[in-house]
Regions:
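A short core secondary-structure module
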Residues: 131, 157-192, 196-197
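A structural signal for short hydrophobic beta-strand segments in well-ordered beta-sheet cores
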Residues: 145-148
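N-terminal glycine-rich flavin-associated loop
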Residues: 91-112
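C-terminal helix-coil-helix/basic helical segment that borders enzyme active sites and/or dimer interfaces
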Residues: 24-42, 255, 259-266, 282-315, ...
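Amphipathic, small/basic residue-rich leader segments at the start of a protein or domain
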Residues: 1-93, 368-372
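A short, Trp-centered hydrophobic/proline-enriched beta-strand micro-motif
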Residues: 124-135
Length: 372
């Protein structure tokens, strides 16, 4: 594989970092943390509208989408670079869900009307999301939500959990089982029951109840398994890339603290126990970086990437746990201050650790692939 970043990767990463650096400050994060929304969560937790608008205006949102939907026809490597920067700044925007998964899937598999929706998402005028998780279902490729074809079109019945930005979404991508096979549908959240869920880092996630809910098929039923695999693969990789950025910045923060904080007349970073924990955290971050880079490169080259993607998500969860706790422990009492920026990075890392499956889930999936 080639570890050399593309020029587009560097440019988009730099541009995303500049936009976030101007708009995502510690005060802004605190403001988002303290925001309170309406009864349905319509104007609530952790959505940074000014940042989303700026990312759209600078072309970041559409850059890695196909030209057919208004993008620059870049790809996975460039999307990974953007997600890494967004994770580094704890950006409260749905780039992964609306652009990578929503617009990306519709651009690739959708009909003309659905591709138009992808174009609007790339321009930032609408938000899309995907409902990939279900309670007590550890196999996202085999959803328990069911789809039935009627004279009036498709109808879905089931329940999805932790659906990001469902309250703001124009449409939700919903995988469901239809006649024993998997298919992917578009659902208008106005026709479903959308309920806010309490999340530690105040990410805007919602339960979505479907009861004979009208839906629109994406692609074909026969191609549904391929479409869902495409979505899940990029969801796992995107989450891992975001976690990489979060852990990189968290490690920078704790390294700065260890250099500046003195105890017994010495910087705490000079003590062997602290230095060893920071060294282990550095190794974890580098391991995750290599895993994410390999998975992204394989996908960009249209090579088999399932094992690499599960490996990256395992590292995102396992290394994320260790690094997040190291950052808090080394900061001492400051680390448990909920008003300190370290708390934001800790909760973000813990959220990324378990989102879309934890380390055990992805080890099981990886083991099944290796056993074939």
């Amino acid at each position: 594989m080639d570890f050399t970043p593309t020029e587009a990767q560097l440019d988009l990463g730099r541009l995303t970092g500049e936009v976030c650096g101007k708009l995502v400050t510690a005060d802004r994060l605190r403001e988002l943390d303290n925001s309170r929304g309406g009864e349905a969560g319509a104007d609530t937790e952790r959505f940074d509208q000014p940042l989303w608008t700026s990312l759209a205006e600078t072309g970041v949102l559409a850059a890695a989408l196909p030209e057919a939907v208004g993008g620059s026809d870049l790809g996975t490597l460039e999307q990974t670079a953007i997600l890494r920067e967004l994770g580094k700044h704890l950006a409260a925007v749905p780039y992964l869900w609306s652009i990578v998964l929503g617009a990306g899937a519709l651009a690739r598999f959708g009909d003309a009307a659905q591709r138009d929706l992808a174009t609007r998402a790339g321009a930032g005028s609408v938000i899309l999301t995907a409902a990939l998780a279900e309670e007590r279902n550890w196999e996202p490729a085999t959803p328990t939500t069911t789809a039935v074809a009627t004279a009036d079109g498709w109808r879905l019945t089931g329940a999805k959990t932790t659906v990001p930005f469902a309250n703001r979404a124009e449409r939700i991508l919903v995988p469901a089982t239809a006649s024993g096979t998997t298919a992917v549908f578009l659902v208008d959240p106005a026709t479903a029951t959308v309920t806010p869920q309490q999340v530690v880092d105040r990410s805007p996630e919602f339960a979505v109840e479907l009861s004979d809910t009208p839906a629109e098929l994406v692609g074909t039923v026969a191609g549904g398994a391929e479409i869902l695999d495409w979505i899940l693969t990029r969801a796992w990789l995107g989450s891992s890339a975001s976690q990489l950025g979060t852990l990189e910045r968290a490690l920078e923060l704790v390294a700065e603290y260890a250099r500046e904080r003195e105890q017994f007349g010495k910087a705490v970073g000079s003590f062997q126990a602290v230095a060893q924990r920071l060294a282990d955290a550095y190794i974890d971050v580098q391991g995750l970086r290599l895993a994410v880079t390999q998975a992204a490169w394989l996908l960009s080259e249209d090579l088999p990437a399932a094992e690499a993607v599960h490996t990256a998500k395992f590292w995102a969860a396992d290394a994320g746990h260790r690094v997040a706790h190291t950052v808090v422990h080394v900061h001492g009492g400051v680390g448990i201050d909920r008003d300190h920026i370290v708390h934001n990075y800790f909760t973000a890392a813990k959220h990324n650790e378990f989102a879309l499956g934890g380390s055990t889930d992805h080890l099981r999936a990886l083991g099944a692939l290796l056993a074939r």
